[in-house]
Every structure is written in structure tokens, then in C-alpha cells.
Amino acid sequence: FNILFKKEYSNEKEYLLIKINSDSSKILKYEIKLPISSKIIDFITFDNLIIFSSSNKKRENLLNIYNIRNKRFMNLYASLKINEKVIGIKKINETIFEVIVLSEELDKSNLLSKRRFDLNGNEINKIQVSIKNRSLISGNFYTINSNKIVGIGLYGKKNSNDAIGIYISSFLDNKLEYLKKYNFFELPNFYKNDEKYLKTNILKKIKNKDFDKIKFDHNFIPNELIKIDNNLVFSAESILLNYNNNNNYTYIPYYNTYAGTYDK
């Protein structure tokens, strides 16, 4: 496994990469000196390369390749537009890596894409998914076989980071086969849809499938959606609005994720 450290007072230009081989207990150290200040967000390593997503002081999102042997630095300018950011990066094999990119469109909707590159930074292929009048908040793509890929993630209203449902997309030979979306209220037992927990007007909207008209007194913030074997594991937290602070509202989490208890 690999560990990356940022050198103190280096203006985010100097890092230390430690590669640990668990089989041989061999530890290798490499000093990384970047030509520009870059806050490294996520990274993967190959034999002589470290490939990482980063952001600079102008808040531009970058995708970079750095050779730890000859210190050569490559910024893949053509791979990202100003409205795009990398939210995931992984190694496919010894010659190919993959990034998941979230793009904000002019109409304030978001789309998600999966892009594969060779080690020279050349884009090999790309697939993307979007939902009309909706924003994709997060997601990932899973290879089923040599020609089938499934994309799964969370979506919300346009220009919103609050998830309102889950989407499932299927690609055959890199072409969209189908796209389905499900509001959380359509999922069995996601919410307790009875009068003990929900107001009558909300239950009526659920019955009529007027999901976009439902308004809660809390925000619903997704944390992660991951695939484990044949199951999807979803974690999130709710933030309750409090209007009892001099007519100004503050956010109060009613579930403390650190203590594992509900706040009073």
C-alpha cells in the first residue's frame, strides 16, 4: 500500500510518497517536487508513476501524472474542463487507469462520466450519464462483463446537493442501454410511510407520486453509496432546521455520527 505526506511549509509543492510492500516488508520513499502548488485530493500509483487529482490556488481541478524516477510532471489540461472535477480515480491494470468526473452544466444540472486513460494521458474511451432536469450528486460505474457496464448513484433537483433518489444506468458496448431513477419514497421501507411519522399532506403527495412537491423540515445529506458483492450500501445523515435562535435558523444534526447517538 501507499502513503502520501505533504511537506510542511512547502506551499503544497513538495510531498513524500511511501510505498510499502506487505509481502517483502520493503519500504521505498520518493520525494515529489511539483512545479505548481497543488493540493492532492486522490492518487494511485504504478511502477514509476503517481497519478493524482488535485486543485490549485485558483480552485481549478486538475488531473496529473508524475514520474517518480525522472521527476517529469504532466498536467492533463485537455482531460478536464473548468466545470469538471474528479470524484474518483482507480487503477484498472498495469497500463490503464480510470477517473470518475462530475460536470456542472450551464443549466445547473450535473452529469457523471467515466473516462479511461493510458499511462501517457491519452483518453481511451468515455461514457456518461445525465438525467433531464436533475443533478447527479454522486455515483460509480461497475463492469459486469467485457461489454456491459452499470452506473449507480444518487440524484437530486437541479442546482441542489440534496439527494432525492437513486438512479441505475446500463451501458452496452459503451452506449446507454437504459436509465431508471427511483425517488426515495418509491423504495420499500426507506421512509416509514404512515401517519405516525409523516404528515397527512405528505402521505397524500406520496400516494399521488408528487414527490417534487414534498418539503421537509430537514436536509437529507448523502455520504456514500457503495457496492458490496450483490448489495448496495447507502449511508446518509439528516440535518434538522432550528428556527428558535432569534428568528435566524441554524442547522442541528439530530444524529451524531461520531458518538453514534441522537442529539437532544
Model-derived segments and their meaning:
Residues 1-10, 42-57, 64, 94-107, ...:
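Short beta-strand elements that form the blades of beta-propeller/WD-repeat-like
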Residues 89, 111-115, 171, 176-190, ...:
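Karyopherin-beta/Importin-beta family HEAT-repeat alpha-solenoid scaffold
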Residues 14-24, 63-70, 110-122, 163-176, ...:
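Beta-propeller blade signature
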Residues 34-45, 82-92, 133-143:
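Repeated scaffold domains used in trafficking and secretory/extracellular systems
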Residues 27, 73-76, 121-129:
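Blade-edge beta-strand/turn elements of extracellular beta-propeller
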Residues 32-34, 78-81, 128-133, 178-215, ...:
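Surface-exposed loop and turn segments in beta-propeller and other repeat-based domains
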Residues 137-141, 199-230:
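Signature of short aromatic-glycine-proline-rich micro-motifs recurring in repeat-based ectodomains
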